[in-house]
Regions:
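Substrate-binding pocket helix/loop in short-chain dehydrogenase/reductase
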Residues: 87-88, 95-100, 182, 193
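Alpha-helical segment proximal to the catalytic Tyr-Lys
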Residues: 116, 160-164, 221
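Active-site helix of classical SDR
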Residues: 111, 147, 155
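Active-site loop immediately N-terminal to the catalytic Tyr-X3-Lys motif
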Residues: 89, 136-142, 164-165, 200, ...
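The beta1-alpha1 cofactor-binding region of Rossmann-like NAD(H)/NADP(H)-dependent oxidoreductases
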Residues: 54-64, 93, 206-207
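C-terminal substrate-recognition "lid" of short-chain dehydrogenase/reductases
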Residues: 108-111, 201-230, 235
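Residue(s) in the substrate-gating loop at a strand-loop-helix junction
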Residues: 131
């Protein structure tokens, strides 16, 4: 049996793939021959994928968007996410629900819409982008950490349910990643993240993309239900 990291001819969806980590993932997949459809709400696409304006928090919008694609995807990357940080006692219901709706319910909507096509094909690969904060919690992120922890549970449950159908489901848990948004943070925040890091450096978006490409490729065909941390040793 030959093993390859190339993804020629395969169809993928990357949510939140128009910029940042999502753009790096999209570009890495396109570079390896995949046809990538980006589901995002932005009008600005910084990736090499085909942009579709889709609100993943809305189940009907997701179902319609997936059904309208030229071919069913056999790869899905649930990357889209938002933050509405506030301490637990001050967090509003809207701040809680908006993050859960996009980060967790959105991933569920995507998985439910894409999995039937993968099951019919007898193969498929799904990667959920979670976070080390879903494993350890973080002050001011009760909503975000809960959603990311929920994605880990979703990953493991989907891996059990879809494994017999030939579909792998895994997660990648980044720590601090040096996106444009991260570079705009106060220096003391970045310094604290560096001090947490065993490698004394922080990941780039391309580091997350590399892990995703591996999990989507045939090289990871016997890996499912796993959470791979790409955090330069922030959480050990």
């Amino acid at each position: 049996m030959s093993f390859s990291g190339e993804l020629c001819g395969r169809v993928a969806i990357v949510t939140g793939g128009a910029r940042g980590i999502g753009s790096a993932i999209t570009n890495a997949l396109v570079a390896r021959g995949a046809e990538v459809h980006v589901f995002d709400l932005t009008d600005t696409n910084e990736s090499a994928g085909t942009l579709h304006r889709v609100n993943i928090a809305d189940a009907d919008s997701v179902a319609q968007a997936v059904a309208s694609l030229p071919a069913p995807p056999t790869m899905l990357v649930n990357n889209a996410g938002i933050t509405r940080d506030r301490s637990l006692l001050k967090m509003s219901d809207d701040e809680w629900r908006s993050v859960i709706d996009v980060n967790l319910s959105g991933a569920f909507h995507m998985l439910r819409a894409c999995a039937p096509g993968m099951v019919a094909a007898g193969c498929g690969s799904i990667v959920n982008i979670t976070s080390i904060n879903g494993m350890r919690g973080k002050f001011g992120q009760a909503n975000y950490s809960s959603a990311k922890a929920g994605m880990i549970g979703l990953t493991k449950t989907a891996a059990r349910e879809l494994g017999p159908k030939g579909v792998t489901v895994n997660a990648v848990a980044p720590g601090m990643v040096m996106t444009e948004m991260a570079r705009a943070l106060p220096p003391e925040v970045l310094d604290r993240a560096l001090q947490e890091s065993a490698l004394r450096k922080l990941a780039a978006p391309e580091d997350i993309a590399a892990a995703v490409v591996f999990l989507l490729s045939d090289m990871a065909r016997m890996i499912t239900g796993e959470v791979i941390r790409v955090d330069s040793g922030q959480y050990i």
